[in-house]
Amino acid sequence: MPTLIVATGNPGKLAEMQTYLEPLGCQLTLKPTEIEVEETGSTFYENACLKASQVAKAVNQWAIADDSGLAVDALDGAPGLYSARYGNTDRERIAKLLQALEGVSQRQAQFICVVSIAAPDGSIQLSTKGICSGEITHSPRGDQGFGYDPIFWLPEHKKTFAEMTKVEKQKVSHRGKAFNKLIHQWPGLKFDSF
């Protein structure tokens, strides 16, 4: 089984991916720092594919990438692709989103994640998508997780992501769903063909 190059410079994302892919026993390593990929896609799918493909070609190895974000219905899908750039810090992003939703009663939202795997020639061999639907709270709750977790409420669990344990969140999150699909489709990958 090949080592997968993770198309990120973020060690936290590498650790998270290793947790999800642990059942497969594959090795993951961060992309070289000198490889920069500009996210110019207009969808999470395009950005995940772009990152995986460019990194795979640059290092001539298999690569994996994900792209994700929060889409709020009342804001026409914003912050969407710009979720990570909606402010400088998690606190700023949350404050900006809550301000944009002030006085809005319909607060449905979805976290979306797309995971893509590219062969050494850059061709995309597998992409999966996970969606987790919930609502945006009126104020932060919980101290686990990161990003928008304190304001993303899952009615069926009566908790925000930030109130869940890591294991609880992995079972229901957008990223968990995308990686679960990937694990089930993994046997179809033809690593020896490249």
From Swiss-Prot:
The keyword Magnesium applies. Keywords: Hydrolase, Magnesium, Metal-binding, Nucleotide metabolism, Nucleotide-binding. InterPro entries: dITP/XTP_pyrophosphatase, ITPase-like_fam, RdgB/HAM1. Substrate binds at residues 8-13, 68, 146-149, 169, 174-175. Mg(2+) binds at residues 38, 67. One of its GO terms (molecular function) is nucleotide binding. The active site is at 67 (proton acceptor). One of its GO terms (cellular component) is cytosol. SUPFAM superfamilies: ITPase-like. Its cofactor is Mg(2+). Its EC number is 3.6.1.66. It catalyses: XTP + H2O = XMP + diphosphate + H(+); dITP + H2O = dIMP + diphosphate + H(+); ITP + H2O = IMP + diphosphate + H(+). Binds 1 Mg(2+) ion per subunit. One of its GO terms (biological process) is purine nucleoside triphosphate catabolic process. Belongs to the HAM1 NTPase family. Homodimer. HAMAP family: Non_canon_purine_NTPase. Pyrophosphatase that catalyzes the hydrolysis of nucleoside triphosphates to their monophosphate derivatives, with a high preference for the non-canonical purine nucleotides XTP (xanthosine triphosphate), dITP (deoxyinosine triphosphate) and ITP. Seems to function as a house-cleaning enzyme that removes non-canonical purine nucleotides from the nucleotide pool, thus preventing their incorporation into DNA/RNA and avoiding chromosomal lesions. This is dITP/XTP pyrophosphatase. It comes from Synechocystis sp. (strain ATCC 27184 / PCC 6803 / Kazusa).
